[in-house]
């Protein structure tokens, strides 16, 4: 009796860590590569530092399936990323475009670097 229960317990614990694998059929390997490339460029809105391929969050799974279906429909990378950006905002892009809202993000490092160079130059000039 105990051997049977122990066997069942071991059998069920072997599969306790199994995860759902996301499978999707593509017409050709190029479409699959395009879909994986696009999904790796988009950030999960729920998981701050994971792309759509790495995240298992429900929103990432939904977005990943949307990318796959749009690739299967023949949409281009620009169209898919544009659609995702329109729906979820610039946050989903790892490389946000240069706009009025993101100008501070792009310019701040340069301004800080120039400011530090100016401070160092003035300190050395006084010596």
From Swiss-Prot:
For molecular function, the Gene Ontology terms on record are: metal ion binding
Residues where heme binds: 44, 47
Q: What is its main location?
A: periplasm
| Cell compartments where the protein resides | Periplasm
Keyword Metal-binding, does the record have it? yes
- Determine if Repressor is one of this entry's keywords: no
Which Gene Ontology cellular component annotation is one that this UniProt entry carries? Answer: plasma membrane
Instruction: State the function annotated in the UniProt record.
Output: Not required for the biosynthesis of any of the c-type cytochromes. Possible subunit of a heme lyase.
The protein, known as: Formate-dependent nitrite reductase complex subunit NrfF
**Origin organism of this chain?**
Escherichia coli O157:H7
**Origin organism lineage:** Bacteria, Pseudomonadati, Pseudomonadota, Gammaproteobacteria, Enterobacterales
Its gene? nrfF
């Amino acid at each position: 009796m105990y051997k049977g229960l122990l066997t069942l317990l071991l059998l069920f614990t072997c599969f306790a860590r199994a995860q759902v694998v996301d499978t999707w059929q593509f017409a050709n390997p190029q479409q699959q590569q395009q879909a994986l490339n696009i999904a790796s460029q988009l950030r999960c809105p729920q998981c701050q530092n994971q792309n759509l391929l790495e995240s298992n969050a429900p929103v990432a799974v939904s977005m990943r399936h949307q990318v796959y279906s749009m690739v299967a429909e023949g949409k281009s990378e620009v169209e898919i990323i544009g659609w995702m950006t329109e729906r979820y905002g610039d946050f989903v892009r790892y490389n946000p475009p240069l706009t009025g809202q993101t100008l501070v993000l792009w310019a701040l490092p340069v301004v800080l670097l120039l400011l530090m160079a100016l401070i160092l130059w003035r300190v050395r000039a006084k010596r």
